[in-house]
């Protein structure tokens, strides 16, 4: 039991608190407030004051333990939440609508450069350039349905165009090799982004779920409207902050690949190529080999060799064969 508690506490570091525990506390607090709105505040006050010392300790422990359990649940489902904000799990009509909106936003950034007045031109050029550089992929074919999806597409496109590296394939192999300062910076930036995305998700869930609970369940339509507005505004603010934070995290990941990608080659016992073209070709070849091993189609060569061996030497002892000439035909 104590070893299990030690394992759990080892996972609760500052990054875990930022990414998952604080959003879980917000979720539990918001849910508790809405539940209290459906009942009587005085009832909960009287009930809490009626508890003895041991019961109050148990209550306090539960108030800490329940958000922690929810935090670990958020960590377990972080990938579906991430895919939702990237837009890859959206229904096709919604995704197509989102891509059209993002294409217009990208075009507007270009138009800002072309149509700005001469005296303000440099300011708008810098602003539009930062938007295009950090928040959109260069290729229009890679535009995603959401702002956050385009930040991740930009992240992937940079490493591919600069070094021939597939970001998602090689980042798990690079991250353990980074020196402590760079590893700490990138992990902190990613934790901040994850925490803001979780807060956005929880804000939307509290707004929609709380409004339904208060309105349909309790008939408190005024309170339901307030909860809906507050929840959705919180979700929108946290999402926009997550997009900006994700772009900042992307800049540090770009720097990590620029500075330390050769550590992977050294770990594999490979020589670092002497020029950029050769290095790009090497990374592309390594990526191709890894993807071929991961997604290799079932090979028919082994089955063909086995069939030829049986036809020449007969089946092995105990091996069953099927005479296809006697099989029924449709």
Which positions does each model-derived feature cover?
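N-terminal first transmembrane alpha-helix
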Residues: 1-116
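Hydrophobic alpha-helical membrane-associated segments
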Residues: 62-73, 230, 234-245
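Juxtamembrane/interfacial segments around transmembrane helices
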Residues: 65-72, 109-119, 251, 255-257, ...
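Membrane-proximal, non-transmembrane interface segments of integral membrane proteins
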Residues: 79-201
